[in-house]
From Swiss-Prot:
Site feature Tyrosine radical intermediate, where: 161
GO biological process: photosynthetic electron transport in photosystem II; response to herbicide
Taxonomic source organism: Picosynechococcus sp. (strain ATCC 27264 / PCC 7002 / PR-6)
Subunit relationships: PSII is composed of 1 copy each of membrane proteins PsbA, PsbB, PsbC, PsbD, PsbE, PsbF, PsbH, PsbI, PsbJ, PsbK, PsbL, PsbM, PsbT, PsbX, PsbY, PsbZ, Psb30/Ycf12, peripheral proteins PsbO, CyanoQ (PsbQ), PsbU, PsbV and a large number of cofactors. It forms dimeric complexes.
Domain of life per record: Bacteria
Gene: psbA1
Residues engaged in binding chlorophyll a PD1: 198
Protein name: Photosystem II protein D1 1
């Protein structure tokens, strides 16, 4: 009997690098998507922090009226933001090398484009990295599918909406008050509250919160006791244990009697699929709604839809909402518009039916 020993050829430097990139033994998985994700997210984060603290005012409307967004120019954490790039730039790609100087790039809001482009590439890669790690571990791929909902929402407000409106100045500002301003102006121009897809998104987010609270409270209330009265019940669970840590039959029985039998899940797998799918589908619809409103396919308009026998308008809540929308419309970008299109396009309404008599 002959035994042959063959020494394995040493792996090349590139092969070792590939093995390290795709290794699931690393404390934090890198992956091929991570090779692009890490530098783009670091770039976006660094530029955002610097711009939020120190960026000079930006001529967002393209009318030579800069808007200050950084902390050093008088803002606080609530009012501060990275201001979107100028309407004078429009949809043009505006990297640093396209500007005549760094001052011009800052004045026209170049950092906003730098942040959102790197951020979007980064979150796309994060989603791909979730799939990649699931694949390496032999898991099913639904984690990245769930994350696609916030990715779609971010893409809608940072990319699709500016494309539809024709300028990155219409993108969502990167700050707290800026986000609220974006929401109010969006309502004024697109009536998003009356769009069915936004309604589905509200049902998804609020419903998801409700279902999460219901599930967590039911599980916590039906834990299998493994500890004494003087210990925390959390000590009754050991990571990786095979036994169920709560009694699903008890939880099912409680909820089935609280509402009715078929309102309660008797299958843990279908329950958790439902908990994951409900908010994801809702946010998908909202992102789709924003993406269609980007091209001015707006929410329902029920203004002045009810008339009496004399043809006079009987106001509904839709008309009250429309009054609020017009108020938002006339207040935003005040110096960029001569008059809001929504008001200028309507029929002329006489201020007085007859001239007043003036008695000298």
């Amino acid at each position: 009997m002959t035994t042959t020993l063959q020494q394995r050829g040493s792996a090349s430097l590139w092969e070792k690098f590939c093995q390290w990139i795709t290794s699931t033994e690393n404390r934090i998985y890198v992956g091929w998507f991570g090779v692009l994700m890490i530098p783009t997210l670091l770039t976006a984060t660094t530029c955002f922090i610097i711009a939020f603290i120190a960026a000079p005012p930006v001529d967002i409307d393209g009318i030579r009226e800069p808007v200050a967004g950084s902390l050093l120019y008088g803002n606080n954490i609530i009012s501060g933001a990275v201001v979107p790039s100028s309407n004078a730039i429009g949809l043009h790609f505006y990297p640093i090398w396209e500007a005549a100087s760094l001052d011009e790039w800052l004045y026209n809001g170049g950092p906003y484009q730098l942040v959102i482009f790197h951020f979007l590439i980064g979150v796309f890669c994060y989603m791909g990295r979730e799939w990649e790690l699931s694949y390496r571990l032999g898991m099913r791929p639904w984690i990245c599918v769930a994350f696609s909902a916030p990715v779609a929402a971010a893409t809608a407000v940072f990319l699709i909406y500016p494309i539809g409106q024709g300028s990155f100045s219409d993108g969502m500002p990167l700050g707290i008050s800026g986000t609220f301003n974006f929401m109010i102006v969006f309502q004024a121009e697109h009536n998003i509250l009356m769009h069915p897809f936004h309604m589905l998104g509200v049902a998804g987010v609020f419903g998801g919160s409700l279902f999460s609270a219901m599930h967590g409270s039911l599980v916590t209330s039906s834990l299998v006791r493994e500890t004494t009265e003087t210990e925390s019940q959390n000590y009754g669970y050991k990571f990786g244990q095979e036994e169920e840590t709560y009694n699903i039959v008890a939880a099912h029985g409680y909820f089935g009697r609280l509402i009715f039998q078929y309102a309660s899940f008797n299958n843990s797998r279908s329950l958790h699929f439902f908990l994951g799918a409900w908010p994801v589908v809702g946010i998908w619809f909202t992102a789709l709604g924003v993406s269609t409103m980007a091209f001015n396919l707006n929410g329902f308009n029920f203004n002045q839809s009810i008339l009496d026998s004399q043809g006079r308008v009987i106001n509904t809540w839709a008309d009250i909402l429309n009054r609020a929308n017009l108020g938002f419309e006339v207040m935003h970008e005040r110096n960029a518009h001569n008059f809001p299109l929504d008001l200028a396009a309507g029929e002329q309404a006489p201020v007085a039916l007859q001239a007043p008599a003036i008695n000298g």
